[in-house]
């Protein structure tokens, strides 16, 4: 059975490589034509692009005080309870640890 599978895989990969090769040919022709129009050489011409000026960003001076959930008492309780629940294993899961 191994030989049959190997032949089937080889046949499929061969046809895929052929299709990719056929698809790459027109791309090379178009790229060559564009290079010929640009100056007759196969090398790409370097064009310098002017640098854009940096944008000025306004930074707010007033600090915004938002209460994080971890800083409040209810947030701490929620985090503590969530940590305990993640350690337990449900009875229906069947994924107990055997040491």
Curated annotation (Swiss-Prot):
Which keywords, in A-to-Z order, does the entry hold? Viral release from host cell, Viral tail assembly, Viral tail protein, Virion
- BP-aspect Gene Ontology terms: viral tail assembly
A single GO cellular-component term on record = virus tail
Region annotation Disordered: where it falls in the sequence = 59-99
Q: Which Pfam families match?
A: VirionAssem_T7 (PF11653)
- InterPro entries in the cross-refs: Phage_T7-like_viron_assmbl
Entry's localization field: Virion
Q: Does the keyword Ligase apply?
A: no
The organism's place on the tree of life at top rank = Viruses
Give the UniProt family note: Belongs to the T7likevirus protein 7.3 family.
Provide the function of this protein: Plays an essential role most probably in virion tail assembly. May form a scaffold around which gp11 and gp12 polymerize. Gets ejected from the infecting particle into the bacterial cell.
Its protein name is: Protein 7.3
Species of the source: Escherichia phage T7 (Bacteriophage T7)
């Amino acid at each position: 059975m191994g030989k049959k599978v190997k032949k089937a895989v080889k046949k499929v990969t061969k046809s895929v490589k052929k299709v990719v090769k056929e698809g790459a040919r027109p791309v090379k022709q178009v790229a060559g034509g564009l290079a010929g129009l640009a100056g007759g050489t196969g090398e790409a011409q370097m064009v310098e692009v002017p640098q854009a000026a940096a944008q000025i960003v306004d930074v707010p001076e007033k600090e915004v005080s938002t209460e994080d959930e971890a800083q409040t008492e209810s947030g701490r309780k929620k985090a503590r309870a969530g940590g305990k629940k993640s350690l337990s294993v449900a009875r229906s899961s069947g994924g107990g640890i055997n040491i």
